[in-house]
Amino acid sequence: MKTIDLLLNNYWIVKETDKENYYAVKHEINDKNIKRFIQEMLGWKIIHSEHVIKLEKIPSHAEPFMGIQEFTEIRDYCLLCAVLLYLEDKEENNQFLLSDLIRYIETVISKYIEVDWTSFSQRKSLVRVLQYVENKGLLKTYEGDSSIYSREQSSEVLYE
């Protein structure tokens, strides 16, 4: 039951920041009873990778409180998806520049929404997403400060 409690009470369990719980849950989710209970009784799915374990709890209908509190625009969610796609292709401890991420976002998202990094509001939106992802432990700032990007388009940050 501790495993289910951990999955319910944590948005995700990151190996790097919570090794003990990560390995405990990883070991327990291979138990067919727990897996069956989560999938058949609750109708949820366990997402497991070498870095993260997450219980994907999709509600039957959305409620106003269900969004990410830090996000203020729909664009924030679009940028989050692009950032997560970019990070998924990166290996652990692989450093990259903010400018590389921005180029990737432009190619992925430009089909769906307008991307104009000269706009303060769009740069601010990206900064909100980067800070959110960093707070969740999926990204580390190695050198620089992403919040400066909202004010200065030419600023550069090194991430890991």
Explain the meaning of each model-derived region:
Residues 26, 75, 121-125:
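Short amphipathic alpha-helical segments
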